[in-house]
Design a protein with these regions (language model features):
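Active-site beta->alpha N-cap acidic-glycine motif
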Residues: 9-107, 111-122, 130, 220
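Catalytic domains of cell-wall/extracellular-matrix polysaccharide-remodeling enzymes
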Residues: 56, 78-79, 89, 102-233
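Terminal accessory/targeting
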Residues: 1-43, 59-68, 181-236
């Protein structure tokens, strides 16, 4: 049997759940994957791309058949449309990370709106789909940002600090030593060390019984409804 729920069509049976977007988006949120209700879930998220290192990240994700969520900068997406298209065509979720990585809380409403809208337009131009998720620059927001963004705001509960360390083993250890079911991991696809760290993180956590999912998948399977203007750092 099926339920029509907030732009999703969800097909259920007794033990597994599969989900696809309706034809409005023509986008399969789960690609050749079924998840048991008892699985431990984790969501990798990547900020500040795309750039030339994003391809390395996508290569590793493909190697392990992992889907993730990319919060892209409009300014970089505009200059790297082929990489953005590859993200989307690979089944990744694409979110909005503003256009110029401004600290939105320091700016007037018209600037905030422009930063978000321009990025959404670039994403739509490349993918044919407007983003459904917002991650403000630096993860900083206020009530004005929440209102103007008009999307669920996704932050994180594990920061790999990959922007600081640029060391794949150290990046991996920050995830492996802290991870819990329902975690959202912050990474940056613009660094080669981040791509390399995935070769440590993914097989280790898969061996521990974790399944890697996109943000919409994570919250769906945790039975949490993502609401516009609300802020989420994990799914538990």
């Amino acid at each position: 049997y099926s339920y029509d729920l907030d732009s999703f069509m969800i097909d259920l049976d007794s033990s597994t759940i599969s989900m696809v977007y309706t034809e409005v988006f023509n986008y399969d949120i789960i690609t050749n994957k079924k998840i048991n209700n008892s699985d431990k879930l984790i969501a990798l998220t990547f900020d500040d791309g795309p750039n030339y290192n994003t391809g390395k990240v996508l290569d590793v994700l493909a190697k392990y058949n992992v889907k993730a969520t990319f919060f892209v900068l409009g300014s970089k997406a505009k200059d790297n449309k082929k990489i953005l298209k590859r993200e989307y065509d690979s089944g990744m979720e694409i979110g909005n990370h503003t256009f110029n990585h401004l600290l939105l809380t320091k700016y007037k409403e018209n600037v905030i709106k422009d930063e978000i809208d321009k990025t959404s337009s670039v994403i739509f131009e490349v993918t044919g789909r407007y983003p459904k998720l917002l991650r403000p620059s630096y993860g900083v927001y206020n009530n004005i940002v929440k209102k103007i963004g008009n999307m669920p705001i996704i932050i994180w509960d594990i920061d790999t600090l990959d922007w600081k360390y640029h060391n794949s083993k150290r990046i991996a250890s920050r995830v492996i030593n802290k991870v819990k079911d329902g975690d959202i991991i912050l990474m940056h696809d613009i660094y080669s060390a981040t791509a390399n760290s995935l070769n440590i993180i993914i097989p280790e956590l898969q061996n521990r019984g974790y399944t890697f999912v996109t943000i919409p998948e994570l919250f769906y399977y945790k039975e949490i409804t993502l609401e516009k203007g609300m802020v989420y750092g994990y799914a538990r």
